[in-house]
């Protein structure tokens, strides 16, 4: 695994429920302090395991001075803070992501997270069930886009045969 210890993290809070202590570059999590750098270091291996090291390393390598802040924040907050919490297992988190991304109609991210879901042991039937459930609440157009995106990845990854 690549070492990213020397990267400084952005100073924006991830959401309203997280308070920042600007003097210490830390996030407050339920009364406890979590250092951004520690969250980044915790998040990087999780991100690489779920999305694949090739994808993550390429994202980090092509991030210029402007985009590196986004990459750092994503790794610390989404992967270190949210995915790093042990309350939910990775399969559950993957299914939640697919449902939320369907609601947001974010096909490129659905593709990425379908591959991540497969890496986390989610079955094709579970992916289909999550997308159908999201379709019932988000509407047919969003569901159709999600199914198309997922289908493309499932065929590419060999989880489905080509029609």
Task: Show the residue positions of the predicted features.
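C-terminal structural segments of small proteins and small subunits
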Residues: 138-140
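Mid-chain, well-packed structural core segment of small domains
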Residues: 103-128
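Short, Lys/Arg-enriched N-terminal segments with co-localized hydrophobic residues
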Residues: 18-32
